[in-house]
């Protein structure tokens, strides 16, 4: 299984990251498009996660940017999928009890906004033969627990975003 995300000069394009023109509460909200190839036979659903581990020195924890589950298996996910789908999506890190702005986005895609230097965002897609059936919205730990014993294949790509 392979993931393809088009980069611009080696970085996630600005329209999906820090310099996006479409934002909510200062955060980019238009999710990036991607293509999947070589899905294993029997794949019916595609959950994924987008996590920034380079945020640990900045805020003390890995920043969750996007969780999606029970997406019917397709080879192409269009731009802005997060805001235009009824697919179950989990909490991103704006739900943190350390963030107090009620206007911030709490579920779905929140684009990269590296504050200190370029960051690599770990985008992992899983191929499943059955749904995760998570109660929406859900947390990353619940997402990971639900994956156990259900993964046919998985693939990861690191998406650099510029400061």
Could you say what each language-model-derived stretch is?
Residues 1-163:
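N-terminus-centered regions that define maturation/targeting leaders and the start
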